[in-house]
From Swiss-Prot:
<dbReference type="Pfam" id="PF00923">
    <property type="entry name" value="TAL_FSA"/>
</dbReference>
<comment type="subunit">
    <text>Homodimer.</text>
</comment>
<dbReference type="InterPro" id="IPR018225">
    <property type="entry name" value="Transaldolase_AS"/>
</dbReference>
<keyword id="KW-0704">Schiff base</keyword>
<feature type="active site" description="Schiff-base intermediate with substrate">
    <location>
        <position position="125"/>
    </location>
</feature>
<dbReference type="InterPro" id="IPR001585">
    <property type="entry name" value="TAL/FSA"/>
</dbReference>
<dbReference type="GO" id="GO:0005737">
    <property type="term" value="C:cytoplasm"/>
</dbReference>
<comment type="function">
    <text>Transaldolase is important for the balance of metabolites in the pentose-phosphate pathway.</text>
</comment>
<dbReference type="InterPro" id="IPR013785">
    <property type="entry name" value="Aldolase_TIM"/>
</dbReference>
<comment type="pathway">
    <text>Carbohydrate degradation; pentose phosphate pathway; D-glyceraldehyde 3-phosphate and beta-D-fructose 6-phosphate from D-ribose 5-phosphate and D-xylulose 5-phosphate (non-oxidative stage): step 2/3.</text>
</comment>
<comment type="similarity">
    <text>Belongs to the transaldolase family. Type 1 subfamily.</text>
</comment>
<keyword id="KW-0570">Pentose shunt</keyword>
<dbReference type="InterPro" id="IPR004730">
    <property type="entry name" value="Transaldolase_1"/>
</dbReference>
<dbReference type="GO" id="GO:0006098">
    <property type="term" value="P:pentose-phosphate shunt"/>
</dbReference>
<protein>
    <recommendedName>
        <fullName>Transaldolase</fullName>
        <ecNumber>2.2.1.2</ecNumber>
    </recommendedName>
</protein>
<dbReference type="GO" id="GO:0005975">
    <property type="term" value="P:carbohydrate metabolic process"/>
</dbReference>
<dbReference type="GO" id="GO:0004801">
    <property type="term" value="F:transaldolase activity"/>
</dbReference>
Length: 315
């Protein structure tokens, strides 16, 4: 059995791509997208007709509405190829505006509904800022499920659990990148691999906290740099994986053992944590890595959204 099939026995495998033509080869349950992945897809010749058709169909509408209709179009194409859910992201430029995020999330859901999609199959993806988490709380109360992304810290995870969001996406690779850069020449790749990887350790800590306290929010590890990070999190609720790494897993016959188990978390000695807004902001600020990576991620997604807008305007 290859590692991809073995992983599917203990974890829900999710494809992290806007290039939906790659989905058939790996048969993921769910899929995730973000502005960067959609931009990458529409830059390919295969997707030029989809972009052009979407722009022509909705020409004359506000630019932000055309953008939402375009990403929903990608989501609908993805949903036609998978049995599960797709995550569609709210504009990252709204990451510090709770009610604007709520409004945009509701519009995205309405657009899916207008296309005949069962909206239980859609997760609204939101950056895990304080404002984003509060927006997710409101959306969940209104029956709209959410995926909180750009999550780099247990502080964010605790707040998301308290907000009863459907799913969180703690990042692995970007945490790894930060610690590797900080260490410079002192970084020992072999010593920091697998279970010792700081990104893997972060997801494991969050997973154990949730399972220990019976928090129902799903944990989906994200942002991987190598398959060692993925196999070290086998057993996590979900893992969202880029097609290149899915291909590597499918090509590997190495044994794969379950690394995370909810039952083992019950025996840990953990203390519950709660954050109000000032406490959240202070605790997140105290984590230099999480603060830097959250800000960097929002800037990158916002920049790619702006590039995608320029492609829409030029179409």
């Amino acid at each position: 059995m290859n590692q991809l099939d073995a992983l599917k026995q203990v974890t829900t495998v999710v494809a992290d791509t806007g290039d939906f033509r790659q989905l058939g080869a790996y048969r993921p349950q769910d899929a995730t997208t973000n502005p960067s992945l959609i931009l990458k897809a529409v830059q390919k010749a295969d997707y030029a007709p989809l972009l052009q058709e979407s722009v022509e169909r909705w020409r004359g509408r506000a630019l932000d509405e055309i953008m939402d209709r375009l990403i929903v179009r990608f989501g609908c194409e993805i949903l036609s190829l998978i049995p599960g859910r797709v995550s569609t992201e709210v504009d990252a430029r709204l990451s510090f505006d709770t009610m604007a995020t709520v409004t945009r999330g509701e519009r995205i859901i309405d657009l899916y509904r207008a296309e005949g999609v069962d909206t239980a199959r859609v997760l609204i993806k939101i950056a895990a800022t304080w404002e984003g988490i509060e927006a997710a709380r409101i959306l969940e109360e209104r029956g709209i499920h959410t995926n909180l992304t750009l999550l780099f810290s247990p502080v964010q995870a605790v707040a998301c659990g308290a907000a009863r969001v459907q799913l969180i996406s703690p990042f692995v690779g970007r945490i790894y990148d930060w610690y590797k850069k900080q260490a410079g020449a002192q970084w020992d790749e072999a010593a920091m691999a697998g279970a010792n990887d700081p990104g893997v350790q972060s997801v494991r800590q969050i997973y154990q906290y949730y399972k220990h306290f019976g928090i129902r929010t799903e944990v989906m590890g994200a942002s991987f740099r190598n398959i060692g990070q993925i196999t070290a999190l086998a057993g996590c609720d979900l893992l969202t994986i880029a097609p290149e790494l899915l291909a590597q897993l499918a090509a590997s016959e190495a044994p794969l053992e379950r690394a995370l188990d909810p039952a083992s978390a019950k025996d840990l000695e953990l203390q519950p944590v709660q954050y109000d807004e000032p406490g959240f902001r202070y605790a997140l600020n105290a984590d230099a890595m999480a603060t830097e990576k959250l800000a960097e991620g929002i800037r990158a997604f916002a920049a790619d959204a702006a590039k995608l807008e320029q492609m829409v305007l030029a179409a």
